[in-house]
A protein has these predicted regions:
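Glycine-rich flavin
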Residues: 2-9, 25-32, 37-170, 203-207, ...
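N-terminal Rossmann-like FAD-binding beta1-loop-alpha1 element of flavoenzymes
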Residues: 9-36, 176, 182-192
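Short hydrophobic core segments
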Residues: 11-14, 119, 134-144, 176-177, ...
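Conserved acidic residues
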Residues: 17, 118-120, 180, 233-237
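Glycine/Thr-rich phosphate-binding loops of Rossmann-like dinucleotide-binding domains
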Residues: 22, 149-150, 184-185, 190, ...
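Glycine-centered short loops/turns at secondary-structure junctions
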Residues: 31, 194-196, 226
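Rossmann-like NAD(P)H-binding beta-loop-alpha module
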Residues: 168-210
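C-terminal structured domain segments across diverse proteins
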Residues: 235-262
Length: 262
């Protein structure tokens, strides 16, 4: 590919998630001079605040059940009551950094120029990355999206699915708002890690669209395990009293907790 108009790059990508990285690498292998910018961590949602850290959390939480099951096979195993949150976070972060490094290496190997910083468009061919300005013939915006908090009183006291992976300490009691598979999975994860868990869903039963028998069985099992379930209600507001959050439900109930994921 031949550059025209003396641009710095033939092709520039804003956003180094899985799509942006893939697009930039393919363009570079076809002969284009390519640049890419990312203001957070390279790899996008899945690597940093999605599939990977969530599965690491699920893996860690699953150990508690193994300790209990081992007793039935003759093992004298005492299940620990407390998870060392600092050790867990260090392990999680190390794995994510390893994957960040792999993505960085793939870009370098393909000959893509990587910029770490916030990119914005100045005109159809000019990109500003913090204090650096570059030009490109073609520009791809691959920035993805960010979670939006509910417009309720006290929403600033709630966390999004991005925030939940950066907790400084393990929640003692977490309230999860929602009934999709992500919310239900987080309920099981934090329960397995030893946190008290409440889940609030606006419908009759979570996991809408899944097999009804599975949904009912899962509800019964979660109740049996001690997960506090609330249906036909939604989060109406949040008040903070020192280290305690008071979650007001549309049903009129109030849940006291220290962490709210909505």
């Amino acid at each position: 590919m031949t550059q025209t108009h003396n641009y710095d790059f033939d092709y520039f990508v804003i956003g180094a998630g899985s799509g942006g990285v893939r697009s930039s690498r393919i363009a570079a292998t076809l002969g284009a001079k390519v640049g890419i910018a990312e203001y957070k961590d390279i790899g996008g949602t899945c690597v940093n605040v999605g599939c990977v850290p969530k599965k690491i959390m699920a893996y860690a939480a699953d150990y508690h059940g193994h300790f209990e099951d081992a007793k039935g096979y003759g093992w004298d195993v005492k299940a620990p009551r407390n998870l060392d949150w600092g050790t867990f976070i260090t392990r999680k972060d190390a794995e994510i950094k390893r994957l960040n490094g792999i993505y960085d290496g793939l870009l370098e190997k393909a000959g893509v120029t990587y910029y770490s910083g916030h990119a914005s468009l100045k005109d159809p061919h000019t990109i500003q990355i913090d204090n650096t300005v570059v030009t490109a013939d073609k520009i791809l915006i691959a920035t993805g999206g960010t979670p939006r908090k509910d417009m309720i009183p006290g929403a600033e006291h709630t966390l999004t699915s991005d925030d939940i992976f950066h907790l400084k300490k393990q929640p003692e009691h977490i309230l999860i708002i929602g009934g999709g598979y992500v919310a239900v999975e987080f309920a099981h994860i934090f329960h397995g890690m030893g946190s008290k868990v409440s889940l609030c869903y606006r419908g009759d039963l979570f996991l809408r669209g899944f097999d009804d028998d599975i949904r009912e069985t899962l509800k019964e099992e979660m109740i049996k395990q001690g997960i506090d379930l609330h249906f036909n209600c939604d989060l109406a507001g949040v008040e903070k009293d020192k280290d305690t959050l008071l979650a007001r439900m549309s049903s009129g109930k109030t849940v006291e907790c220290d962490t709210i994921l909505s």
